[in-house]
Regions:
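Small/polar-rich, solvent-exposed N-terminal microdomains that initiate assembly or binding
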Residues: 1-66, 128
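Active-site-adjacent structural patch at catalytic or cofactor/ligand-binding sites
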Residues: 51-59, 63-93
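A generic structural motif
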Residues: 91-98, 168
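Short glycine/proline-enriched loop/turn "hinge" motifs that connect secondary-structure elements
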Residues: 42-44, 77-82, 152-156
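"Short basic amphipathic alpha-helical interaction patches in structured regions
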Residues: 64-69, 100-108, 122-125
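Acidic-leaning, charged glycine-interspersed low-complexity segments
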Residues: 102, 112-169
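Short, cationic low-complexity segments
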Residues: 73-79, 177-191
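Short conserved micro-motifs at the rims of enzyme active sites and ligand-binding pockets
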Residues: 61-63, 172-176
Length: 191
């Protein structure tokens, strides 16, 4: 689901930017900021880069379910659905600084307009994803961004961080099947 959510966000942002600036080529890439050897990947040049920087499990469990009723009335016992928040670093990487700022501004506009992506706003949302919410992460300012870029092994670039909320990861494993309880009378067993 993580890959599907990132690919969908990439495609949706890419289409927005292509429409806004009248572009024919793709301008958004989901990729790491720096290769293992410390260089900027070629595919990142003159692109808006989306990279996953953190994953956290959603701790509010009121929407989780463990048992699912089957057509025959019995229940399927599966592991709990788990929901995660993904932290995305969005960094335009253009040779011209003005282009970097232009695409950063347009990216912020995209997430302001599309704070929620679901089937009502996009018919192309992937199967298994019902809703994605995006929340701007203000963090602790300059020092936090400096530390992040240092940890990534890269030079700072103008960028923003968004929290993508509630990506559900569901296990396909079934733990057990359980019979349903049928009550046919109000009598107790002792009667």
């Amino acid at each position: 689901m993580i890959l599907k959510a990132l690919q969908f966000t990439n495609r949706t942002l890419n289409q927005f930017l292509k429409n806004k600036f009248g572009l024919s080529d793709d301008v958004v890439v989901t990729n790491k900021i720096i290769d293992q050897n410390g260089t900027v990947p070629i595919e990142n040049q003159n692109k808006v880069i989306i990279t996953l920087i953190h994953v956290e499990q959603e701790t509010v469990k009121s929407f989780y379910r463990k048992n699912k009723q089957l057509n025959d009335g019995n229940y399927e016992n599966k592991p709990l659905d788990e929901r995660y928040n993904l932290y995305l670093l969005v960094a335009p990487n253009f040779e011209q600084y003005n282009e970097t700022l232009k695409f950063l501004n347009a990216t912020i506009q995209f997430f302001q307009i599309n704070g929620v992506l679901d089937a009502n706003t996009s018919s192309k949302i992937p199967k298994g994803i019902s809703r994605l919410e995006f929340e701007f992460e203000k963090g602790d300012g300059y020092l936090q961004m400096h530390n992040l870029w240092s940890a990534l092994g890269a030079k700072y670039q103008p960028s923003v961080i968004y929290k993508m909320r509630l990506v559900t990861i569901v296990s396909d494993e079934i733990n057990a099947f359980e019979s349903s309880v049928n009550v046919t009378s109000n009598r107790t067993i002792d009667d």
